[in-house]
Amino acid sequence: MKIGSIAALLSLLLLAPTMQDFLSEETTRFVQDSESSHDGLPMEWDNKQVICIFFPIEQPHEKYSQGVTMIDENGIELGVNTDLNRTGACVGGFEGFSNGLDFMMNSTRLAGGALSVGYDVGQWGAFIHTIGGLNAGKLTGDFNGAYWSLEHNGAYSMVGIGDLVMSEGDVVSWSIGTW
């Protein structure tokens, strides 16, 4: 009896992470509206503030290299959307932020350091050079230079993150741009 109980308990302990991942992915439903800046994000984040960090295929993030990991406002991973043809992480479900830089710094902290942000402040405001350990200025390839590109609700932002005024339901995303 004891050996059977111990074997069952060990099996349960070994399978718990796999079952948790399966249940998390099965219960997370994503917005499917190509006209919405929330397309591909969890449905519970619709009309909430979200930040997404997308890493280049050539420079995948160590932790977020398979699809886009969704992290809620409490730092809990909700699941991974593998249908976005991108890799990275989105942190969302927020309300009430009005300053883009404050939102970015507060939301990325919830990834437990995996999305740490490095920036310099110059005459034009905050310049983001590193996200999640990837310093755009150190990238090499078939291009002259690289930078972290900011999008606001699916369009290139006309202002930097320090001057970005947030509204409810805004989606901010970062990806590597080159010239």
Where is each model-derived feature located?
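Ubiquitin-like/PB1-type beta-grasp interaction modules and other compact soluble beta-rich domains
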Residues: K2-W179
